[in-house]
Amino acid sequence: MRGKADRFRPLPPCVVITGPTASGKTECALSLAQRFPVRLISVDSVQVYRGLDLGSAKPDRDTLARYPHALIDIRDPYQPYTAADFAQDAEAEITRASASGRIPVVVGGTALYLRALRYGLDSMPRADPAFRRMLLERAEQEG
């Protein structure tokens, strides 16, 4: 993943469709997919998780079968997925789509993910599950 130091290293050109919930992002992306050789790449922090279909406006199974989207249903809900993970995965998908002659179309409304993709993130250590457990135990004991 690109960090702040190399944030201006260019990605292959791509189309970005973003906006608030229920603004027609998916419909716009599907319209492009009907007309052009595109690769749809989801930018949604909930749609990455399998089974979290309600409340996320995740395209239904028929739509996904007809118009596959990268980065949908790639994790189980108990598995962490960070903005850094997204940026790395999306960059790979954009590069792969471009190399195969398809137009990468990044579609979704998770602004932090888009920002991480465009500008990178400062280097930070990974979350420490043991430290998290200790903090949760302490909070439970002390309130």
How would you name each of these model-derived features?
Residues 1-143:
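Phosphate/pyrophosphate-binding catalytic cores of soluble transferases and nucleic-acid-acting enzymes
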